[in-house]
Regions:
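PRPP-associated nucleotide enzymes
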Residues: 1, 9-204
């Protein structure tokens, strides 16, 4: 049980013996790959940091697709509905180069946005995406009083500093997340892999 009787606390969760995630710090490199176990641990650490800060939020928003998994951790542990806002900027060079940002007009999961908002994503890279999303939300939903940002990874060249993060990179490695094994695989190739006995998303 993570929630107290009123559903407003994270009593047992905050007592868990979390250790520093500095073990995930790495020397400068162009690519870094995370296993499922490391990825899950990062998500738990992020929720823990927000919980221990004592800051309470009224609404929870994640950015699609990168923020959906971290957002799900927050939604389940806090017992709050998760709103999903679709954004897209990585399009060129097979998804590794940022182009113009598109922000969806509609958001799923919440009928009304107001009060304090926690915005969750997987990383702050250039920082421009979250910066534009924050401006968009404040303009479109004037009842919002405060927006704070929580991410797994924060890169030094970002124009925005998140309120909470797990790993800080002084350089700008390309981060490979464990579920990328499914990217652009296609239903036919996926089916063939499963039929041949392969487990693409195995725990590592």
């Amino acid at each position: 049980q993570f929630l107290d009787a009123e559903g407003g606390g994270l009593l047992e969760f905050c007592r868990l013996p979390f250790f520093s995630l500095s073990l995930f710090s790495t020397p400068p490199m162009s690519d870094i790959t995370y296993s499922w176990n490391e990825y899950i641990r990062l998500n738990e650490e992020l929720v823990y940091k927000v919980a221990k800060s004592g800051w309470q939020f009224d609404c929870l928003i994640c950015l699609s697709r990168g923020g959906m998994r971290p957002g799900d951790f927050f939604s389940r542990i806090y017992g709050k509905p998760l709103a999903v806002l679709a954004t897209s900027s990585y399009r060129e060079a097979k998804g590794t180069v940022q182009s113009n940002l598109d922000i969806a007009e509609c958001m799923t999961g919440l009928a009304e946005l107001k009060g304090k908002v926690l915005l969750v994503d997987d990383m702050v890279d250039s920082g421009k995406t979250i910066q534009e999303v924050v401006a968009h939300l404040k303009k479109r939903y004037p009842a919002i009083t405060e927006i704070r940002v929580a991410v797994l990874w924060w890169k030094a060249h970002s124009v925005l500093k998140p309120d909470w993060h797990c790993v800080y990179f002084e350089d700008s490695p390309w981060i490979h997340q464990p579920f990328e094994c499914y990217d652009d695989l296609g239903a036919e190739a996926f089916s063939e892999a499963i039929e041949s006995g392969k487990t693409l998303g195995r725990l590592q």
